[in-house]
Each structure stands twice: as structure tokens, then as C-alpha cells.
């Protein structure tokens, strides 16, 4: 992998608003390289600061000249690409204004994949496993024009109660006033 060619390739991807990559994505982008050359090239791009390792197996093209919208959500999608994921728990309830504190350090995501915590330079991503069916997830989330769908108020509250934490932060009166018919 020649560094100049790699930078040009990554720049072309960034023009299409793609700046967060998995290791597998990069391997496909640079498929012509033999494995040792790919590994060496990837390490050189990271060392030179052109790519930034965000967490294990996730990289960010650092030369982008555009702001990255919802980077934590993009990283979450990349980390659990083969799973159904949605913004829920404290993150969703905060967006709806029915929780008394705003989560500042990261996002809370429900996933059909494995639970886990990932610390990145953009903040923390907390995955909580759900056994909900895909149909149930689709019925209780909505597309809000971002990488992750958003749980309905009722679903986020149900998720919060199911995991058994921070229920004391929910302003029940606000929930009843603002979202009486949410489903």
C-alpha cells in the first residue's frame, strides 16, 4: 500500500461522507494489497496520523475537512454491523426530555448483538443486549435521519426498567404530559 495512493483513496471516500471504517472495510478498499503489505500500510497510516484508531478494529480518516455528524452513532453501527441496534435507555429518554439528566459522555444503544462498553475519542458507547424480536424493534423505533433509529418513549422507558437502572431520573409527570399516547 503506497501512502499517497491510500490517502487519495480515503479522501475519495470522505467526499462521500464515509470517514469511519472497520478493519474489514479497509481490507476491502485495499484488496489488491497482500496481507503483510496491508498491515504495514495500515500501521504507517495510523503512525502518520492520517488514520486514527478509535477503538479495536475501528478507524477514522483524520484528514476530513467536514464535520462528522453523529460520530458515536456511526461508530456504534460499525461495531455491531450485523445486528439490529437502536438508541434507547438514557440517551433516548434525554432526547425526549423525560429524563432529568443529559448523558454527556456517550450514548446508550440496545442491540441484538453482544453487550459491551467502548471508549472512543468521541465518547463512550454502551451496548446493552436485547432479546426483542426484529419485528418488535421495528415497531417501537423510528428513523430520525441519523445512523441509529430512536426508540419510542415507551420502548426506551421499558428498556430502562428492564435493565434496572436510573429509573429515578425519569420525570414521570413530564412523561405523562408530553407523551401520553406514545407507543
Language model regions located:
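Surface segments flanking catalytic/ligand-binding clefts of nucleic-acid enzymes
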Residues: 1-9, 176-183
